[in-house]
């Protein structure tokens, strides 16, 4: 957690990628943190590897990964298969499970 605070202090912009083209831009950018807002269980591992191979911290938005059930097992899948650094979700159970897996978490909520 301290590493991400240090990285954001130096480079406070976070890249959010929603397609393969934006992944290419993000890995070449100065952003140290990338939020992955797309993918499926078939390709999320490759997407995360590409981001991590560029030396970036990668969060996966679990709610937006096609084919991923929004249950506690989603956190374990994200930690083991794509080996992401963190999870974003609107679901409290997914966030709790991700923390228990040792992942950084962002609990996304909407205010009206």
Q: What is the predicted function of each stretch?
A:
Residues 1-60, 66-68, 83:
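Conserved N-terminal beta1-alpha1 strand-loop-helix module at the mouth
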Residues 50-81, 86-112:
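Conserved anion-binding
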